Amino acid sequence: MAYKQSITKSDTIRETAGYPTYPSGGVHGGIDTVHTDYKAYAPVAGTVVTAHIWEGSNTGVDSWGNYIVVSMGGDKYWLAAHFATQRWNVGDTIAKGDFIGTQGQSGNVTGTHTHWEYWVGGFGTRYRQDPSTILGIPNGVGTYAVEWDGGDTPTPPDPPGPPAPGGKLPIWLYFKLSRR
């Protein structure tokens, strides 16, 4: 059985921590997922109400690294965290299935993943609910077959890699190296 969802275009998803506890028993306020292509997409449409840029700390709100909080209306919000970079601004509109970021290791993390939270009844962690209800996947550690259900949103191209060996140096680097 493949779970219909809009958070990855991969055909499998790995959940490394569920809600409300880690496999080790500690409190965990969301669900952590790892996607084969490391790209994350919006589970539900809404408006960005927080767009945090990681400042290098692993405590407080910075523990989520680069993250967004999206209002779904009616006192319902979702959070997606630990992105490699921040690409959103407060007030931006996000559609279900929109690319929201590349999974990263910003904030307090033990590996590359996206941390998802779902808040119902108000804004903030005290309103946490099981995010599996909006993610479309089970709440439990494991690897699951998934099927894309997010429409035809375009996938961004992969960022350019390093120059090929033997390639030309940028002119500024050539001059910098020649001054030594």
Give residue spans per PLM region.
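Acidic, glycine-rich catalytic/binding loops that coordinate metals and/or anionic ligands
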Residues: 1-9, 14, 34, 39-40, ...
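Zn2+-dependent peptidoglycan hydrolase active-site motif and core
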Residues: 28, 42-87, 112-118
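A residue-level detector for short acidic-glycine micro-motifs
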Residues: 17, 35, 50, 82-85, ...
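Conserved beta-strand positions that form and line the central face of beta-propeller blades
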Residues: 32, 69, 79, 102, ...
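A structural signal for short beta-strand/turn segments enriched in small hydrophobics and glycine
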Residues: 46-48, 91-103
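Active-site scaffold segments
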Residues: 30-32, 96, 101-102, 113-119
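Short, charged beta-turn/beta-strand-edge "cap" motif at the junction between a beta-strand
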Residues: 54-56, 100-108
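Short glycine/threonine/proline-enriched tight-turn/helix- or strand-capping micro-motif at secondary-structure
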Residues: 11-44, 53
